[in-house]
Amino acid sequence: MHPARPALWAAALTALTLLRGPPVARAGAGAVGAGPVVRCEPCDARALSQCAPPPTAPACTELVREPGCGCCLTCALREGDACGVYTERCGTGLRCQPRPAEQYPLRALLNGRGFCANASAAGSLSTYLPSQPAPGNISESEEEHNAGSVESQVVPSTHRVTDSKFHPLHAKMDVIKKGHARDSQRYKVDYESQSTDTQNFSSESKRETEYGPCRREMEDTLNHLKFLNVLSPRGVHIPNCDKKGFYKKKQCRPSKGRKRGFCWCVDKYGQPLPGYDTKGKDDVHCLSVQSQ
């Protein structure tokens, strides 16, 4: 993950908190709030000892905590002052919000282009986001696009009846045709997705049958080695596989210093051959052993 992304996510969550309302209590206080919560470290005596003396009146009329997870006290912003995610907090009863004509409200708060306004009169986040059109104000293109969303609908909407009151039969046929077209398109998409899933499943099954058990064990071992901090060759066994992914007759443990690892004989599925104990022997010949 890029090192700057956590800071950007924290800033975005802070901007959403400014738009939604005053921040909830600190995580250590046991308060539970809705939405995302940024957990801050508790303000202990060590953290408070590093704070500078707070400003005093008349330069500062109200003291508030620093923005973010800060523990020190600073002057609160007054109504109408510029504010943002990285600036000081607004005073009691005020909320930092973007300008009414701001095109990008979150970006404005990140860049400090908001202003402190009365919390009771400030709008919520939905005020600055695109709102859904009312049912009676749907445009003609949107209505045509959504005409077939309800399969059982054969009668057009109220405002469409008013527009086509002289041709009710044509209006009904128009809606029915659009519904059939939408259903056929939906069936086509579902069929293509099912076909793609079937192809993926068949390819995975084919790959599973092409690779034998030895090849799968070797891949699992190599994947496991990626997550090990300390690699010990003595504790790692990589199987000896043939070209088709099955076990070769002779399998050996890794050497330990000057001592060679012992070998043994197995069948193509990796099962030790019965009646052939080779543990502790340095040289083993499995060519004459018949696999079962």
Curated annotation (Swiss-Prot):
Main function: IGF-binding proteins prolong the half-life of the IGFs and have been shown to either inhibit or stimulate the growth promoting effects of the IGFs on cell culture. They alter the interaction of IGFs with their cell surface receptors. Also exhibits IGF-independent antiproliferative and apoptotic effects mediated by its receptor TMEM219/IGFBP-3R. Promotes testicular germ cell apoptosis.
Keyword Secreted among UniProt keywords: yes
Molecular function via GO: fibronectin binding; insulin-like growth factor binding; insulin-like growth factor I binding; protein tyrosine phosphatase activator activity
Residue ranges of every copy of the Thyroglobulin type-1 domain listed in the record: 211-286
Cellular localization per UniProt: Secreted
Assembly mode: Interacts with XLKD1. Binds IGF2 more than IGF1. Forms a ternary complex of about 140 to 150 kDa with IGF1 or IGF2 and a 85 kDa glycoprotein (ALS). Interacts with TMEM219.
InterPro entries per UniProt: Growth_fac_rcpt_cys_sf (IPR009030), IGFBP-3 (IPR012211), IGFBP-like (IPR000867), IGFBP_1-6_chordata (IPR022321), Insulin_GF-bd_Cys-rich_CS (IPR017891), Thyroglobulin_1 (IPR000716), Thyroglobulin_1_sf (IPR036857)
The keyword Cell membrane is assigned to this record: no
Basic and acidic residues bias (residue ranges): 178-191
Disulfide bonds: 40-69, 43-71, 51-72, 60-75, 83-96, 90-116, 214-241, 252-263, 265-286
Post-translational modification, as annotated: Phosphorylated by FAM20C in the extracellular medium.
Glycosylation sites: 118, 137, 200
UniProt-listed GO biological process terms: apoptotic process; MAPK cascade; negative regulation of cell population proliferation; negative regulation of smooth muscle cell migration; negative regulation of smooth muscle cell proliferation; osteoblast differentiation; positive regulation of apoptotic process; positive regulation of insulin-like growth factor receptor signaling pathway
GO cellular component: extracellular space; insulin-like growth factor ternary complex; nucleus
Signal sequence range: 1-27
Name the record gives this protein: Insulin-like growth factor-binding protein 3
Composition bias, Polar residues: 192-203
Reported consequences of knocking out the gene: No effect on baseline apoptosis in the testis but germ cell apoptosis is dramatically reduced following treatment with a gonadotropin-releasing hormone antagonist.
Keyword set, alphabetical order: Apoptosis, Disulfide bond, Glycoprotein, Growth factor binding, Phosphoprotein, Secreted, Signal
Record-linked Pfam families: IGFBP, Thyroglobulin_1
Region (Disordered) residue spans: 128-152, 178-212
Phosphoserine sites (modified residues): 149, 202
